[in-house]
UniProtKB/Swiss-Prot annotation:
Its main location: cytoplasm. Pathway: Amino-acid biosynthesis; L-arginine biosynthesis; L-arginine from L-ornithine and carbamoyl phosphate: step 2/3. GO terms for biological process: argininosuccinate metabolic process; L-arginine biosynthetic process; urea cycle. Homotetramer. Belongs to the argininosuccinate synthase family. Type 1 subfamily. L-citrulline binds at Y87, N123, R127, S176, S185, E261, Y273. Gene3D superfamilies: Argininosuccinate synthetase, chain A, domain 2, HUPs, Single helix bin. It is found in: Cytoplasm. It catalyses: L-citrulline + L-aspartate + ATP = 2-(N(omega)-L-arginino)succinate + AMP + diphosphate + H(+). It comes from Pelodictyon phaeoclathratiforme (strain DSM 5477 / BU-1). L-aspartate binds at T119, N123, D124. GO terms for cellular component: cytoplasm. Keywords: Amino-acid biosynthesis, Arginine biosynthesis, ATP-binding, Cytoplasm, Ligase, Nucleotide-binding. This is Argininosuccinate synthase.
């Protein structure tokens, strides 16, 4: 009788490294390790040999970067999705795509089970398992971190050392790091105390603002229907544009985020993020929307932005609601075409200029010079009608 097969999400980190051996021993199963390239900078060429050495029978490496940018990141950017107005959702956006890739691999390899290395009090367990249920409800899902005997990262490290499993986490380097092209999340260690400033060694790519260049960097980003298409006058793919903005932003200390956020499971957590390109692009996109969107659309879209961010954060990417919101967002983005010029300086992003063929800014109406075409006399009648309801209310209630 052939062994059962388990497809697992494999990153090469502490949890998934020891998970291979633990699952193999517990279920006497073959392990198919799946790694998705979402633009992480850490070395990935040695992951296959590491997974096999740890006990996996097969390793699948999938380059998901193009799909990640075009089908996930750009949708979130067009929606203006920032969780609780801060987090650009790098990890949260990557999880449904990675989970989908694991399901596809599992079905192709004849696996009967899926496994992830998410903790029992984190968000990612929800994101993976809801996606698994959406795409392959017939496959059994295993969550080793919710049931195994290890109670701390220290005990996991000890298990790894006992079984000669190579891991980068040590008691001297206790950070848990997740990375993709849209951002890096850093947690654990001293970061769990919200009164402790993040040590410099916690940051992975960004220069400290104090040590950033004394000369500002100026960038020009061109958008077409809400999607960035060129940087400094050069047309480029979305992937290349994000990579370049990450380099420029990181060098200038842009994109460091420190927040207390509300997790799906009901607790608050302290998270450190590095997201240079995401910070720059969300800022530029929002300023172009200010120029091109009609007032009621611009103001209402803020509600949609938060709803969209919540959907991503809560693991509901494949829900009908997300698809329905996409239809609204896509309609709003038709005029969001134009150029935005920004200054990046010592961690800050500031606006230098913007223009668009669909600009709703009319200088002749806005100016206070003699070229003013605004009908000032019309204001009196407008104000009378605009305030008539409150005037009537006041007259009635004052009289009583």
């Amino acid at each position: 009788m052939s062994k059962e097969k388990i497809a697992i999400a494999y990153s090469g980190g502490l949890d998934t490294s020891i998970m291979i051996k633990w699952l193999k021993d517990k279920y006497d199963a073959e392990i198919v390790a799946v790694t998705g390239n979402l633009g992480q900078q850490k070395e990935i060429e040695n992951l296959e040999s590491k997974a096999i050495a740890t006990g996996a029978s097969k390793f699948q490496f999938l380059d998901l970067r193009k799909e990640f940018v075009e089908e996930y990141i750009w949708r979130a950017l067009k929606a203006g999705a920032l969780y609780e107005d801060v987090y650009p959702l790098a990890t949260a956006l990557g999880r449904p795509l990675l989970a989908k890739a694991i399901v596809d691999t599992a079905l192709a390899e004849g696996c009967t089970m899926l496994a992830h290395g998410c903790t029992g009090k984190g968000n990612d367990q929800v994101r993976f398992e809801v996606t698994f249920a959406s795409l392959a409800p017939h496959l059994k899902v295993l969550a080793p971190l919710r049931e195994w005997e290890f109670t701390s990262r220290e005990s996991e490290i000890a298990y790894a050392l006992e079984h000669n499993i190579q891991v980068s986490a040590t008691k001297k380097n206790p950070y848990s790091i997740d990375e993709n092209i849209w951002g890096i999340s850093i947690e654990c260690g001293v970061l769990e105390d919200p009164m402790v400033a993040p040590p410099e060694d916690a940051y992975q790519i960004t220069t400290s603002p104090e040590n950033a260049p004394n000369t500002p960097a100026v960038v020009e980003i061109e958008f077409e229907k809400g999607i960035p298409v060129s940087l400094d006058g050069k047309k480029m793919s979305g992937l290349d544009l994000i990579i370049r903005l990450n380099e420029i932003g990181a060098a200038n200390g842009v994109g460091r985020l420190d927040m207390i956020e509300n997790r799906v499971v009901g607790i608050k957590s302290r998270e450190i993020y590095e997201a240079p390109a995401a910070t720059i692009l969300h800022f530029a996109h929002r300023e172009l929307e200010r120029l091109t969107l009609e007032k009621s659309v611009f103001q209402y879209k803020k509600n949609i932005s938060q709803d969209y961010a919540n959907i991503i954060y809560n693991g509901l990417w494949f829900s009908p609601m997300r698809k329905a919101l996409d239809a609204f967002v896509d309609e709003t983005q038709n005029p969001v075409t134009g150029l935005v010029r920004l200054k990046l300086y010592k961690g800050g992003v500031s606006l230098l200029g913007r223009n668009s063929p669909y600009s709703l800014y009319n200088e002749e109406l806005a100016t206070y010079t003699e070229s003013d075409t605004f009908n000032h006399k019309a204001a009196a009648g407008f104000i009378h009608l605009y305030g008539l309801g409150l005037k009537t209310y006041s007259e009635v209630h004052t009289a009583k």
